[in-house]
Amino acid sequence: VFMDNKINIIIPRSVDLSTRYELMSKTCVALSLSDVETFAGLELGEIKEEEIFYICVDIANGHMRKLIDLCKSVKQKYGGHVILMTGNIANPDTYIDYALAGIDFVRVGIGGGSVCTTSANGGVHYAMASLIKEVVDHKWETEKANKDAEAMRISHKYESLPFIVAAGGYDNSDKII
C-alpha cells in the first residue's frame, strides 16, 4: 500500500535481515553497522540496471570512522545502485566526511527530538535549528571555497552535496522516520 502510493517508509531493524534484503529495492531499509558489514560482503549477482537499494544506516554515533569507511566501500562496490542515508551527526565536519564517502542523505540532529533517547540516556543534546544552520553554513562555505567540493560531487550521483535530513530521533527502531 505504501509503495503503490509513493509513500516512503523505513523498514525497521526489528524485521528479520533476509526480509529487509528482499525489500531493499522497493523501500528504504534500516540497517545496523553489523548489517551493513554483512551487506558489503554479499555478492548480489547481476544487479538489474534499474535496480536501486535504499539503505538507512541507523547508528547512535554517526561520527564513527568505521561507519564512514564502511559506507564508502558500499558506495564504491555498488555505485548508483545504492542510496545511503545515515547518521545522526552533530558536527559540520562530519557532514563533509560523509559527502566524501558518497553518502546521499545525512541525518542531522542529536537529542533534539521529543522521543530521542540519546539526550536522556547519554546526556548529549544539540539544539536542532542551531545544528542545521551550522551544517548548512559549513556546506555552503565548502562549496564556495571549492575545498573538496568537486571530490564530494564525484563521490555520488548528485550534482550537489548530500541532502540534509533533520532527524529528531525516535525511542525505538520500529518508529517510522
Describe each region flagged by the PLM.
Residues 3-167, 171-177:
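Alpha/beta enzyme core
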